Amino acid sequence: MYRALENAFNATGISWAECHREDRGDGLMVMAPSRAPKSLFVELFPHAVAAELRAHNATRPVEQQIRLRLALHAGEVVFDAHGVAGAAVDLTFRLLDAPVLKQALAESPGVLAMVTSGWFFEEVVRNSPVADPAAYSRVRVAVKGTTTIAWISRPDRPYPGDHESGATVTMTATSSDSGRVYQAARDQ
């Protein structure tokens, strides 16, 4: 998982070395530098992660294959001697633990299910010239005392009927480590 994420971050122009990372046992919390454009996380990053996971899985037996839930949010955090804390971190983990996200991945033949906070969807997804808001499904999340609206996407296996029509906008990123090229496009 670490190698796939490192390659995906680097391929999208976000230096893995500059990201704060904390192993959380069965998962990983990664915080990108604040200067990293949030739009990359909905335009290129999901496609890069999915491609890296598929490449990993193609060379592994079924029991070693990886499918991933990914939560996206932005906000203020506090660093202390024990790591990172704050309401933004709490919300991100509530989104990640949401049964509806687990169900989205379980029902998908793909390798990635992604959830964004309501704020991230409204401010980043809707304002991106590449990300397709129609590829996201609005859901209600209620986990550990947190109730909120979130948006789920399955970047490598969209929900049926998720598309818009019109002109095409394309972005490309190349991973110097793996040599793979990732492309994201949106019909507008």
What are these model-predicted stretches?
Residues R35-V139:
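Catalytic beta-strand-to-alpha-helix segment of the class III nucleotidyl cyclase homology domain
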Residues H73, V115-S117, R140-A142, S153, ...:
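Residues in well-ordered beta-strands of folded domains
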Residues P129-G166:
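Intrinsically disordered, low-complexity terminal regions enriched in charged/polar residues
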Residues M1-L40:
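Catalytic NTP-binding/metal-coordinating core of nucleotidyl cyclase/transferase enzymes
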Residues R24, G110, T146-T148:
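A generic structural signal for well-ordered coil/turn residues at beta-strand boundaries
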Residues G118-F120, D156, D187:
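A broadly conserved detector of short glycine/acidic/proline-rich loop/turn motifs that flank catalytic sites
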Residues G161-Q188:
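Long, low-complexity intrinsically disordered regions enriched in small/polar
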